[in-house]
């Protein structure tokens, strides 16, 4: 695997070739990955995989025409041919008045913000095997667990380098580790499954394997013997593990491309109250050891902490250069791209801030409601905000979380749901997107 500086040199060299060959502008992205995965099942080693690969993508512009090509072959002649092919394709492509590199004056010109995202380790597969085994053993030890889908552990490192023809060049490395267990409880038609996992940048931050396994087992057992209940309009409470999916719907609705195409249910919501005034949503690209931390975006713009929702108010769209030009605005440092195609947009370490009440207080006045721990399917209309998803979880009666429920449907409209959300004070930073326990009183629930 290359060092970040070597990866940066490789991207720079490809840009130089493209300019010499006649490109008016160009950008290149180099990505190298190496990963080891170990899977255990019923105490036995089921699978060990080691993967390594590198790829480079080149985007060239000839006037307002552009083309993107990529290669996993780093042979100099292959890359030279790649440049020629890209230029030939660009000359035949239709013009796009919004295409182009990011505005030069917005590029990151200073030393990138230090991102603590790589611990430099490459653990032996035996270490991963032991972690996976401990997680599965702990899950299987929970009373009521009858079978296992396995325990898994993985370790990986990535190098990313980006260069543009108008002055940006940068690279960074990240490491990543994950540990999971998935088990089955019960017998016959009454079987239920569940899982637990942890994903971190530094190996030393990984949750104890025994705790992950225990959580998986207890979650599976807690789902046994689901009950039926009366359908209707009622409060819905989202567990943080599934509540963060609401962040995804929100981000999709404020992306520049969705706004430019007029395909967002928040099309007219800029500078207006979208959530309750007690809530804020913040993107933190420089969080130490954050799962998506980065110092620059996919176009070479600096990243920065951003309050997308400030006391309930929508402050901005998230835009790469093309959609920003279409909207007559400036890109926001949220461009994201791979080796193929033009940049899209994405956020980094996103979270919704804490509320002011405990989880117990959040649900104590609910006479009849549901606590959701699982979501199934993707029945969400991004244009209207209509929301209907399969779900599972637990019944709430008289302020207490009670027996499990399964195969239910929860439905509403995201605009109404967002405005009615109330947050507990139990936020934890476990995923790329994090929320506290959330409650909305604007939904209808159909029982299974």
Spans of model-derived segments:
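Active-site bordering "gate/hinge" segments
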Residues: 1-294, 298-301, 310-313, 398-400, ...
